């Protein structure tokens, strides 16, 4: 007989919320959407009860330590449910089945890729020609679209923005919704109005899949069609230590609007270091060996609907681009606020 006693979940979860795009009913249905989110959250938590919120650090990073039992796809802060051993044991067969199948497929792909005739293998070891491009992420199937998660301030109960990510008839992804800079009158939230989509492509048993295969290319390549707004591309590089969890490298994505596609080639040398979205004084080049995810964020402080259509994301190589890093950096004095 199994005795139930509480086990803390230190990695919170969140549900994925979608909304109608460019719908006049979206504003009037805000209360319904909020109730639906709360209902889904409670259903997802099972019989667990929400505990008292943990304190948040200076950059909004949770003080809750990592727990590998419960992955946190969206990095939601302060959601810390209480699960019993009985619930964990009941979930084990399903976890073993799904993750085991994923591991088997991973091993199979590893053996199939070991061939000198494979173009990807040659690219990974540095044999990349001038003007060569590789497309890594498309959105022509639901399975590929499911690798991407979305979020906005209303998911964190910090605003009223909404967003969705759906397939189009052309086999592309449409990231759309509504940005609202209206601030909640709770005495805590100071700014609002953002939405994002982020890659959550992981290996079996929730292991990170790094983008190290991009290290021999010079540019990030995107084919997009926007609405004239300025978005932001983010390369996320969280490491094992908690003070690196907010590390990312960013670059603006300016869209033209209108019916025409634009091919954006952004040099990796021009990505600047940010922590939780804040530009840092100490700048250094992005290390793609540590980059595990890519995201697109909209936070331009403009109320209204938005729409970004994405055909593919990949990398491009330009051998004439010899710039290592585009921004100034400096050597800190021996005695400084960061230590030796």
From Swiss-Prot:
One of the GO BP terms on file: mitochondrial electron transport, NADH to ubiquinone
Disruption phenotype: RNAi-mediated knockdown impairs mitochondrial complex I assembly. Reduced body size, reduced fat content, fewer embryos and an extended egg laying period. These phenotypes are exacerbated when nuaf-3 is simultaneously knocked down.
Gene Ontology molecular function terms on file: unfolded protein binding
Localization of this protein: Mitochondrion
Transit peptide keyword on record: yes
SUPFAM superfamilies: Galactose-binding domain-like
Assigned keywords, A-Z: Chaperone, Mitochondrion, Transit peptide
One GO CC annotation: mitochondrion
Keyword Plastid: no
One Pfam family per UniProt: CIA30
Family according to the record: Belongs to the CIA30 family.
Protein role: Chaperone protein involved in the assembly of the mitochondrial NADH:ubiquinone oxidoreductase complex (complex I). Required for normal growth and reproduction.
Name of this chain's protein: Probable complex I intermediate-associated protein 30, mitochondrial
Species per Swiss-Prot/TrEMBL record: Caenorhabditis elegans
UniProt gene name: nuaf-1
């Amino acid at each position: 007989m199994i005795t139930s006693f509480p086990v803390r979940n230190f990695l919170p979860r969140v549900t994925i919320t979608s909304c109608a795009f460019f719908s006049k009913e979206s504003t009037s249905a805000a209360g319904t959407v909020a109730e639906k989110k709360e209902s889904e959250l409670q259903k997802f938590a099972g019989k667990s009860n929400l505990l008292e919120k943990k304190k948040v650090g200076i950059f909004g990073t949770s003080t809750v330590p990592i727990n590998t039992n419960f992955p946190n796809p969206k990095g939601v802060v302060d959601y810390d449910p209480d699960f019993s051993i009985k619930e964990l044991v009941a979930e084990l067969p399903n976890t073993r089945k799904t993750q085991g199948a994923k591991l088997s497929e991973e091993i199979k792909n590893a053996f199939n890729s070991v061939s000198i005739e494979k173009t990807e293998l040659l690219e990974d070891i540095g044999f990349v020609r001038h003007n060569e491009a590789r497309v890594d992420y498309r959105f022509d199937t639901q399975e590929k679209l499911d690798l991407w998660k979305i979020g906005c301030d209303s998911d964190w109960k910090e605003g009223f923005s909404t967003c969705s990510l759906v397939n189009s008839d052309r086999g592309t992804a449409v990231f759309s919704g509504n940005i609202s800079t209206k601030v909640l009158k709770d005495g805590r939230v100071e700014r609002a109005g953002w939405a994002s989509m982020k890659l959550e492509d992981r290996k079996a048993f929730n292991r990170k899949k790094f983008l190290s295969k991009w290290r021999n290319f010079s540019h990030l390549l995107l084919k997009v069609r926007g609405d004239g707004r300025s978005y932001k591309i983010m390369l996320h590089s969280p490491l094992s230590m908690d003070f690196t969890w907010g590390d990312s490298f960013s670059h603006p994505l300016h869209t033209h609007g209108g019916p025409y596609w634009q091919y954006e080639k952004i040099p990796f040398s021009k990505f600047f270091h940010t922590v939780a979205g804040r530009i840092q004084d100490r700048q250094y080049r992005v290390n793609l060996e540590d980059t595990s995810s890519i995201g697109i964020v909209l936070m331009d402080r403009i109320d209204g609907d938005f729409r970004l259509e994405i055909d593919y994301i990949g990398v491009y190589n330009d051998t004439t681009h010899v710039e290592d890093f585009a921004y100034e950096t400096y050597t800190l004095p021996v005695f400084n606020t960061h230590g030796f």
